[in-house]
């Protein structure tokens, strides 16, 4: 028996009782940073605002920040930003978001680039955007034939998410402009 055999396996019911910010990966709790850096939060807010402004006329989609996405009874993720469409009004997200944005920090980079990348791909999230605040750039991935296809690195360009219900877009120059020195 390995050490993992002795770790407790937690469920969504357990997760709901915990204080602080957590995610649940296949029954194992992952503590999230208690308070991200101001730059991280400001860029996340700017990304959410840009997405939200571009879908304002669409009544079927919403942009949310740090909302629980319950994938199963033992897996709950809390992406930085999601674009959801036709989601029932519930206490958590129940189906794959159209777009997920994760703003990288030193403590989450490996999880965001590996575990979450693979999970979002497997769960058929149409677009995954990984934002690098220190570099003021974002990588955009589009689901194609059940695999993520990198659309490019964006810093001063715009990207149209053509396969979303609300035809969302992000002007990365507008998002990053105020953070440039």
Name each region found by the language model.
Residues 1-181:
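Gly/Pro/Ser/Thr-rich low-complexity, intrinsically disordered segments predominantly at protein N-termini
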